[in-house]
């Protein structure tokens, strides 16, 4: 199963990264890929997948459960009070899968001297805080009245960017492809 799954994944990447022009960001969501979520480990060959992405789009950033930009530990658009981009990792490969590097995304003390002790290497691994504009990540008409206010979004921006993270707002298109 794992070989078939990885072959399929790489073929999908080949299609997406060769048919649509330059791609600057690939988001690999960590939800459901490890045993913490569904009780079993999903056998992705991350090194193969990331190498294929870099081969086809050399300038692409690999984000999420990936080696270039890490998940900030919440989906509320909020950075930590103290956020460090230098992180200690346990992976020896530069093309590590983000869930397997010894960084606990929800730790309040990432990047401190204590958290770096005993790690194999240090990497530049900036944080990204997700911010759904609605109640969840996808468009549902029932959520039209749950769109977050401008004041809330501005506060999230400053409490994320102002604390050394970037913010990824989710703007979900409706069935017509329009972002309401």
Describe the function of each predicted region.
Residues 1-180:
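Mature catalytic domains of secreted/periplasmic carbohydrate-active enzymes
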């Amino acid at each position: 199963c794992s070989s078939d799954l990885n072959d399929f994944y790489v073929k999908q990447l080949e299609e997406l990264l060769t048919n649509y022009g330059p791609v600057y960001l690939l988001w690999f969501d960590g939800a459901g890929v490890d045993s913490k979520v569904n009780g079993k480990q999903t056998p992705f060959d991350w090194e193969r997948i990331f190498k294929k992405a870099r081969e086809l789009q050399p300038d692409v950033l690999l984000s999420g459960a990936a080696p270039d930009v890490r998940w900030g530990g919440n989906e509320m658009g909020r950075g930590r009070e103290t956020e460090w981009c230098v992180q200690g990792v346990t992976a020896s490969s530069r093309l590590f899968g983000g869930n397997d590097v010894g960084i606990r995304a929800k730790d309040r003390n990432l990047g401190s001297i204590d958290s770096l002790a005993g790690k194999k290497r240090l990497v530049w691994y900036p944080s990204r805080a997700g911010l759904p504009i609605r109640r969840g990540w996808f468009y549902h008409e029932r959520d039209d009245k749950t769109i977050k206010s401008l004041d809330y979004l501005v506060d999230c921006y400053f409490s994320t960017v102002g604390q050394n993270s970037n913010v990824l707002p989710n703007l979900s298109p409706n069935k017509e492809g329009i972002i309401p």
